[in-house]
Amino acid sequence: LSAPPKLTLKTMANLATKWSWGIGMLGAKRRGFGNIVGHVKGISDTSSLGSWTAEQFDPSLDWDKIAKLKEQWGGKVILKGILDAEDAKMALKVGADAIIVSNHGGRQLDGALSSIRVLPSILEAVGDQIDVHLDSGIRSGQDVLKAMAMGAKGTYIGRAYIYGLGAMGEAGVTSALNIIHRELDTTMALCGETNVEDLGRHNLLVPKDFEGRWQEYVGAGNA
């Protein structure tokens, strides 16, 4: 996956067999990132967008730079992408105000640990010294309840509202959020709870080896 796409002989030969699709695309509106192209200085097409995007990533980013960013910013800093207890401790050490336990969505590796499976070890590592939130896999109100009952202070969604956006635009996003809210409300009622602050492990049936199995596997892999 690259931008702009590179035309090869194989690609061109493949396109030649899709001539009807090609004709249709000639009359279609050119697609791009509407919130960037035309709004960010110097970004006018896919090619310049690709170069600009590459410039936004700093491969030398480390914990010391996050601490300096916190100092220069002067506001609250929330770190997303924490999937390990040691990283959670480092986030606390460099001054993060909150962390989001989150995996990478499959864009870097084909697989990763689920965020809710590592949540207990992260909470144990940092306690209540820092707010711990969670995303990755939140698709329903029941998912929200599970995460908060496990100890997360809050949850985030992405794909859930994107589905609504794709189907019905702004109204679809509102509908998706309302559905999740109703599901959470219903699940809480069936659990006998009226306040999210009262949610806890007593609302869940968590297997004793829920976390232990992956820790054992990781330990064996590092031996």
List the predicted regions and their residue ranges.
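Active-site entrance/lid segments in N-terminal catalytic domains of soluble metabolic enzymes
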Residues: L1-K93, G105-Q108
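Alpha/beta catalytic cores of nucleotide-metabolism and tRNA/nucleoside-modifying enzymes
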Residues: G32, R117-D135, R139-A223
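Glycine-rich, proline-tolerant flexible connector loops at the mouths of alpha/beta enzymes
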Residues: G50, N103-L113, I162-L165
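Short loop-to-alpha-helix "cap/lid" segments that border enzyme active sites
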Residues: L61-I66, E71, L113-G127
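Glycine-enriched alpha-helix->loop->beta-strand junction motifs that scaffold or abut catalytic
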Residues: Q72-K76, L92-G106, V126-Q129, G151-T155
